[in-house]
């Protein structure tokens, strides 16, 4: 017995413009699509329920192709600093925070909104009795107070390879940590099986409410023993209908493989070895070929020495793994592309270029010759556009987030959020991809790089499943595919500009069953 969904604009995303009015779902699969009358007659004895979609629009359910699920769940339970405009008020809020441990944590501050970069002295003025950490929105920079420095064992002469410790005018540590220096924080703030499971449940509930039913995630380094984190996934995905694809951080890959922990489970599997080549534009740690426009003495940070980076790629190949690399600056992309050319992926597989934020024509031409996935976050463009002009200048900024050029190379373009760094709201990702404007309103940046709405939607639906080899039954709304879909009040294909951001999600459905409902649409 099944459910007949009728009176909808049901977009298959199998090809542009293909839309059906009704579909019959049974045992979690789409049995048939077409006109309501025909389906009523064909399945007359098997229709248990009829759902009237009331003219709403239906799309395949979304997959976030770049997220940190455990970290996102943690952030939902911590002080949200993303909208903070006054540092002292933020710290006073943090001072009242209750926690299971003694660290006081705030997530996602933006020094541009605060009007200043926090330092340990500023934090000490409000909270000096407990260790405090403020994580910048990019999560490549964090600030701790004096207690935090003490807890991390950081002293004046400490040197961090692949990272940096901020200093004041007198050369003393000012509490600002960059890139690899944050690894010490991860160890201090690490979770366990129970805590990580709670974070996962919190994250998945939130994702369902955004139409997201699957994710490509990277969590195994930051939250304690990677084997316990894998156990947390087993606990949660044994009870929640969510599909996860786990990348494996290079610092834990040996342990995970030695314990034979990468066996595919029903609702999650494992992918490439993840590594970082550089940092972020916001922290001026993305690796550039020319200096930052607003800091001529800075070109960014190499997280790994070139010989170490090469050794990591060789290690992945020894393990028979693909490589997924965080590369934002053009110099970082060039380093990684050179290594992929030197150590090609196994035939029939693809490496993953994460972010690929700043690309000249030469790099795009080289990428065209490689079997790669482009792991893109269109929301970054709209979040950061004003800052990008500051960091890169008026000319170089036109080479950022070249989505259309990358798609035209034949590379598989994936849409994601990098939450908790940016919002999981897919509407924001679609807006960034098709409008290429700031959320605050601006002219279009390099309009030739805009995606069509069809291309943008596919990057969040079908393409993520192609990347993981699960596209035979997922990512489209066609006969025999899993009945995973979202129902929206308005039609994304008719919306322009900011109207995209205001479309309302009515329902998220997994295997034919609602997992989120904003309103009852059953008649």
Residue ranges and their predicted role:
Residues 314-324, 331-351, 356, 361-365, ...:
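His/Asp/Glu-enriched, well-ordered alpha-helical/loop segment
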Residues 517-523:
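Glycine- and charge-enriched low-complexity intrinsically disordered segments
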Residues 237, 260-268, 367-369:
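Acidic (Asp/Glu)-rich catalytic clusters
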Residues 2-7, 11, 15-26, 30-257, ...:
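Divalent metal-binding segments
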Residues 268-285, 372-382:
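Non-cysteine beta-strand/loop elements that form the S-adenosyl-L-methionine
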Residues 97, 206, 466-467, 515:
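Short alpha-helical functional segments enriched in proximate histidine and acidic residues
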Residues 6, 26-27, 277, 481, ...:
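A cytosolic small-molecule/anion-sensing beta-strand core signal
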